Amino acid sequence: MYNAEGIMMNSVDEFKITIHGKGTHGAYPHQEIDPINIGVHIHLALQELVAREANPQDICTLTIGQFNAGSAANIIPESAILQGTLRTNNISTRENLLNRMKEVCHKIAETYRGTVEIEMVSTVPPLMCDLKLTLEMAEYMSQVGIEGLKGIPNSTATEDFAIIAEKIPITYMLLTVGFMDERSDYPLHHPKVQFDENVCVIGAACFVYCAIHWLENHKNRV
């Protein structure tokens, strides 16, 4: 079992950038406003924001996972869409980069005579573990043979359970299960990854044991 005090996983902001240009035939580029060109410059500028405006001591990563534009090889399209995520473990860094991202996108689009719309698709805060509750759960798990929790560094992954953690104290733990084939090197979420699900019995037992004993010891709060 693994756990981290304080921030365990990063926040994530998913965004969608729609670039509007002016489409035309590829033979007449001087008559158009190329949204693909604008999108390329925006993509590069966003990477530079992280490299030059985020504190190197903070965990921060910005990923563009989609870049969609056009329908034919010889046509400059009317629009282009970039979609991506910003992940960080620092609230101040997050707010600053989101503001700067919007500013940079609009300025670049204006430079190349286009316009841009930025939509925040979803937001998940950092996952914060409550130390007191975590230590209590660790004590319960020691009673079923799991001695102590191994610490892990803050992860760039995110977890929407963090939304609940903003309302009530929570703890969050990771159960390592290994692979069915020890030679496997497929990462999490890969379609070919196969975990050793036999280990899930241990996780289920810990979950039930902790829940029962917490309820027994906190009857006045239920």
PLM region descriptions:
Residues 1-77, 156-159:
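Histidine/acidic-residue-rich, glycine-tolerant segments that coordinate divalent metal ions
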Residues 6-14, 23, 32-35, 92-145:
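Metal-dependent peptidase/peptidase-like ectodomains
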Residues 17-19, 80-88, 118-121:
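Short, hydrophobic beta-strand segments
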Residues 25, 39, 84, 137, ...:
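Divalent metal-coordination and catalytic microenvironments
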Residues 44-51, 119, 123-177:
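Active-site-adjacent substrate-binding region
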Residues 51-61, 110-119, 147-154, 216-222:
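Flexible, glycine/charged-enriched surface loops at secondary-structure junctions
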Residues 73-98:
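A conserved active-site cap/scaffold subdomain adjacent to cofactor or substrate pockets
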Residues 149-217, 221-222:
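Zn-dependent metallopeptidase/amidohydrolase metal-coordination segment
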